[in-house]
Amino acid sequence: MNYQAMMKVLVSEAVRIATFPFRILPIRKNRILFTGLTGGRNYDYSCNPKYLYEYMRDHFPGQYEYVWAVSDCEKYRFLEEEGVKLIRHFAVSSFPMLLTSKVIVTNGSYAPWFPFRKKQYVINTWHGGGAYKKVENGRPDADWATKKRAEFCAHNIDLFVASCKIQEKEMIQKTFCYKGEVVRAGTPRNDRLVNGDIGDMARKVRSHYHIPEDGKVVLYAPTYRNPSEPVVFDSDLILSRLQSGVCSGLLAEHQNDTGKWYFMCRFHRYQEPDGPIRVKGEHILNVADYPDMQELLCAADVLITDYSSCVWDYGFLNKPCFLYVPDKQEYMKLTGFYVNVNEWPFGQAQTMQQLVDLLCTYNADEQKEAFHQHLERLGSYETGESCKQIAAYICKNCN
């Protein structure tokens, strides 16, 4: 039995009773509340809600009242300069704001645990594109409490945002048992990636970490998991091979560059520092606390991950992407995939030497074509206008 999930079910019922007195407060038709789940109990100014908010702010100035529910209000005081009201995620003091906002935009499991009112409008953008690893309640070992949590989620949501056809069918409708309206808009955080508007995002990251203009970045971003055997990534080996020039074909536009390579590592927030996913090496930039994964992707010249949905986002940049998956068979058995990992359009390695070989034999045209076919197979809904489409739903429900 997943006791944590069971406790959340019980807590949600308790909250439903505790918030009853607040229901006499009128709903503010122009109030929009955003919240972005970033892992565990962390809620930040991030992910799809962030990009949707910025679109609304820029295209509808002065028309709406914006609220952000975050874990640490002090981190985001700059939003108050834009007129945003900050509330602490799930603090009792936040309940009146939660129950009087006309539209609530979340990217994950915020919605299931709060008894929103029937006249409120809850949008779930989700926090991953494509259709890759199965979500918790869709896995073979999912228990009653975990599945019950998914039912709460489906019941509370009025509009679910889908990035592709397979995600809509297999995750949204099948795993979550969601029967409501789906907007086939793609993901707000990918609009700029799809449109190629990434220059300032990349420069922001490079400036933050003092990476020179001719510097090149490889980003390692493993997803959360607990394999039976440690997964150890040798960053020094990768950097030495890249710096030596033996993989000169990896970045065609940099073939004659002599700039230094930098290794960035971003662990999932669930992953313990001394856990089974490890990186060894002397020159590692830990970017786990950087607030925006999309900006990191824009700054990276090469991405190495495993089962993360960031491959969907990064694919639109037409840059080299590889999967380091020494625990692939175990992960397939314990977690599973909506689309078999062996059919993903990126080179896969189960040893460090295999990864080096992939780096040195990379063919940009082949990966670009493979990703294009992948988008067709999954039925991509990404057009670069996700924010515009979802904003139309928000405006309609706020008027």
Predicted regions and their residues:
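Membrane-proximal basic amphipathic "stem/tether" segments
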Residues: 1-40, 47
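C-terminal amphipathic helix plus adjacent low-complexity
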Residues: 1-2, 198, 352-399
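Active-site and donor-binding regions of nucleotide-sugar-utilizing enzymes
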Residues: 32-197
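Conserved catalytic-core segment of nucleotide-activated headgroup transferases in glycan assembly
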Residues: 44-54, 58, 188-277, 349, ...
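Short, charged/polar "capping" segments at the starts of alpha-helices
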Residues: 44-45, 72-79, 168-171, 228-229, ...
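Donor nucleotide-activated moiety binding/catalytic core segment of transferases
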Residues: 87-102, 269-312
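A donor-sugar binding/catalytic signature common to diverse glycosyltransferases
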Residues: 104-126, 130-133, 289-334
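Catalytic binding pocket for nucleotide-activated donors in carbohydrate/polymer assembly enzymes
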Residues: 309-378
